[in-house]
UniProtKB/Swiss-Prot annotation:
This is Catalase-peroxidase. It catalyses: H2O2 + AH2 = A + 2 H2O; 2 H2O2 = O2 + 2 H2O. Signal peptide: none annotated. Residues 215-228 have a biased composition (Basic and acidic residues). Homodimer or homotetramer. The active site is at residue 92. Bifunctional enzyme with both catalase and broad-spectrum peroxidase activity. The record marks 88 as: Transition state stabilizer. Its cofactor is heme b. The gene is katG.
Amino acid sequence: MSNESKCPFHQTAGGGTTNRDWWPDQLNLRILHQHGTKSDPMDPDFDYAKAFKSLDFQALKQDLTALMTDSQDWWPADFGHYGPLFIRMAWHSAGTYRIGDGRGGAGSGQQRFAPLNSWPDNVSLDKARRLLWPIKQKYGNKISWADLIVLTGNVALESMGFKTFGFSGGRADVWEPDEDVYWGSEKVWLGGDTRYGKDQVKAQAPGQGDLVAEPAKHGEEQNRDLSAERNLENPLAAVQMGLIYVNPEGPEGNPDPVASGKDIRETFGRMAMNDEETVALIAGGHAFGKTHGAGPADNVGAEPEAAGLELQGLGWANKFGTGKGGDTITSGLEVTWTSTPTQWSNEYLNNLFNFEWELTKSPAGAHQWQPKEGKGAGTVPDAHDPSKRHAPSMLTSDLALRFDPIYEPIARRFKDNPDQLADAFARAWYKLIHRDMGPLARYLGPEMPNEELLWQDPLPKADQPLPSEQDIAALKTKVLASGLSVGELVSTAWAAASTFRGSDKRGGANGARLRLAPQKDWPANQGTGKVLAALEQIQGEFNNGGKHISLADLIVLAGTAAVEKAAKDAGYAGNVQFRPGRVDASQEQTDVESFAVLEPLADGFRNFTKARYSVKAEKLLLDKAQLLTLTAPELTVLIGGLRVLGANHGGSKHGVFTDQPGTLSNDFFRNLLDMGVEWKATSGDNESFEGRDRKTGQVKWTGTRVDLVFGSHAQLRALSEVYGSSDGKDKFVKDFVAAWVKVMELDRFDLK
């Protein structure tokens, strides 16, 4: 008998067929409970912002600068300088950000975890982070991995002669992989079939998709018709599973620079970069370093998540030659762009336009480009052998900057005006590494730029005295006497606050942008104009009396007053917390195009959908709840409360399971859980339902999928039972008020 067969355990905890295996379409409420105290090793009172402020920032930068040229035998530096490797590390950490849902990005150090730590596009970045470990170990919790990864990229640029725009810290680490990010539904690495498939799902609920590894294929075009229109699935911002942006060989391995330009524009645009920023990032980033494709890809071993224990979290062990240095295999491409790969220059663009290019292949068989007629030979140094020289080389995605009709004039202008490139690259790089940080109130450190940038959603300074408690009480009275209903006041405050996204910290009530384009014109906000007009009148009268309240504060205060009234009408006294200090942004401080991505295509909290989607309404609700950083109990209690308060879009009666709308009762849960009611679909697509009395057959209620899921889904029903019980009334009111205040203050980083 083998030793293995003697083991009394055939499987350990967590193994076996899971609920997700049995019911893959089941709502995944786990995405609402990520990054909690059970996975966080830090003390409950640990304050990262406070720790960061105690950091000797300049000493850290000096240590990072010294590391750049401290080549290690176990992973030698190209050209004796780690700068290009660290730029790629920072770029690939920040570059996962996509503007569609704000997810991805550098904000929490996710590059340390699966799947990002094992993406094909991140080969060798495991080595970059290991090179950083002695410095991280030295400074400990005063610098997060998330901040250190980005700062190291900044210092790398500076160490090679480039003047950066600045750096801000404030990215706190998490300690487990994100489960909410939808990276695509392909089942193999570098697959792209479903994100461009004809029958693709146009919008995805978060956290779906399983992955298996597949060997990289270089120089092989996939068998799909590239002449067909390429519609990249939303919210994805990469052309293939496991890539940051585009395939550098061209779309799916097709070495067509013009087609590559289209992919670049799509993917960089989804990361909130315009054409000029895109050209600047590529031209600036490729001023440094090289790519690696010394030999065939089948020499490379498993990625970190699949590698053996003895490799200690490193992956892609390379059996080609020494497996490092001049024998390194990363992308399979073997390209060095300039003769000064560790010094800032404009040579990348000079080479791009001054040479004519012909297609060739790397030693790994990947499509790349070399100067025609052998020109440029001997001008580029070898990364590890001083006796060798090379010609410059380019990627298909590089040639896109020359042959794309929009990129070409921008790139040519940068070639002829190096100062313009330097400024554009500095600003675009700063935007790249800070795009998911949210408002300036979150920025930390001595190198924060003084200039406010439009993409940061700037707010005016709060320089007015705050209203007193007596003022607030008087304003509540005026609001409640204005003739506006509880439902109107609540839904307007919700419309303002619920644009917040915990992913990139954008949106929220602060700024009162609900009154500005584009938010004032969103279908989801129909009916808020009437409320805003009334509130602006109250604001004007109050401010004309020598005092001040912002409209942003008044919107939230009005909703809060309505919640207090509804609770009082249900028999519960007490005040709902309101903390003033919000300000009103101007239209000039509001980038209409940038804010357009915050538009709710569906908001189950208001029973609103803009159109019919292939993703079920309850999954869109879950996505919204996760972006609002809600827990499952908070999601549940908010739905029940908002329904009985009459906050539905357009005054819809769906889900208003009460005879006393406007009163903060637990009627939604009591009536949903009533076994005297039988539910049946009233639409062919099972989107709307009616509940009939089992005895009389009379219609009692109507509802949507978002309403009925709280009685159908086992976990949500369990939560609904808590609030629908006879002793759950007090808890319902208390929990609703707490969740309401949380949402109203999600963007109040000035209070945190």
